């Protein structure tokens, strides 16, 4: 909302006046939301705030919050330009796109990269250590520890490369994807270029790119979300297989675990060192994949020009990534 307002002020063919750098700073200061600020937004949505009646609408509550905060400033003459011609999904899909992009860049890709490098190190370190292979659970021709780790590292690398090349499609084209309000208000503006220019300004170096989707309904169809989530699901499946194989190597005493200082393996059998990290990882990856699978089946389908059922699903993205 804030960057959109600023971008409007910089466009020569739109009726907003130019904002000073100080005024742009006033808008951007709103991004550092305190707990009290968040409570104010929620109050506007649920029970009302001051003279504002409850909106029962989260994005509208954000709009009113911004207007309340900017009252009494030099921007008071521009308050009605906040949310101009936007539908809520124009705001939300950009916000989710940015959150997913940041999550990948700052958390997911570094974490997966660390796992990949650790397994690749094991592959190189133990490439000459012989290991009895098993097919159908029975003794088979020998292999090496390093080679079996290499199988997993090469699979992870392929998925990691695909994840690094991900793109997230986003939209900014109004209530039904047709720029209706935009074109009526300012027919002289090239709104397709406006959309592309605004979206691409978020593509800072190292970030998973946001790509403008110019042909949508009220919502972006989420196909690029599905591509991302299916990529994550494949990675998780590979890691589940890795956990299960390491579990078996530990069980067969090919691999020995070292207890942490003070660690208790069992409440009644103190000699045990259970492979709980691998087991917990397997369980958590399974939960994540159940969510990613549902996201992929649910999100690309929306009734006619949109229904709201995707909104509550999107609020669970963080659970799957956690």
What are these regions (language model features)?
Residues 6, 10, 248, 252, ...:
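Short, well-ordered loop/turn and helix-capping segments at boundaries between secondary-structure elements
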Residues 1-182, 186-199, 265-266, 276-282:
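A helix-coil-helix interface module used to build multimeric assemblies
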Residues 287-322:
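Long, amphipathic alpha-helical stalk/connector segments used for oligomerization, subunit docking
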């Amino acid at each position: 909302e804030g960057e959109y307002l600023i971008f409007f002020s910089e466009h020569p063919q739109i009726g907003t006046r130019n904002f000073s750098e100080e005024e742009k700073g006033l808008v951007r200061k709103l991004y550092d939301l305190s707990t009290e600020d968040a409570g104010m937004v929620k109050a506007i949505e649920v029970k009302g705030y001051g003279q504002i009646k409850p909106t029962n609408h989260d994005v509208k509550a954000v709009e009113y919050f911004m207007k309340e905060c900017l009252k009494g400033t030099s921007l008071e003459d521009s308050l009605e330009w906040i949310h101009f011609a936007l539908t809520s999904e124009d705001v939300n899909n950009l916000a989710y796109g940015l959150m997913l992009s940041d999550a990948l860049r700052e958390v997911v890709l570094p974490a997966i990269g660390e796992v990949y490098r650790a397994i690749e190190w094991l592959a190189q370190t133990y490439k000459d250590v012989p290991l009895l292979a098993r097919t159908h659970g029975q003794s088979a021709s020998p292999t090496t520890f390093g080679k079996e780790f290499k199988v997993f590292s090469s699979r992870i690398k392929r998925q990691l490369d695909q994840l690094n090349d991900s793109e997230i499609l986003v939209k900014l084209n109004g209530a039904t994807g047709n720029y209706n309000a935009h074109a009526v208000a300012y027919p002289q503006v090239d709104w397709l270029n406006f959309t592309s220019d605004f979206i691409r300004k978020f593509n800072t170096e190292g970030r998973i790119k946001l790509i403008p989707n110019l042909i949508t309904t009220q919502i972006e169809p989420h196909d690029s979300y599905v591509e991302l989530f299916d990529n994550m699901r494949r990675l998780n499946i590979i890691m589940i297989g890795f956990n299960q194989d390491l579990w078996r190597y530990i069980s067969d005493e090919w691999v020995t675990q070292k207890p942490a200082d003070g660690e208790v393996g069992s409440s009644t059998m103190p000699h045990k060192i259970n492979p709980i990290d691998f087991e917990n990882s397997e369980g958590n990856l399974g939960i994540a994949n159940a969510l990613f699978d549902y996201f992929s089946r649910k999100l690309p389908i929306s009734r006619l020009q949109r229904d709201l059922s995707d909104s509550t699903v999107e609020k669970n993205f963080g659970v799957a990534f956690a």
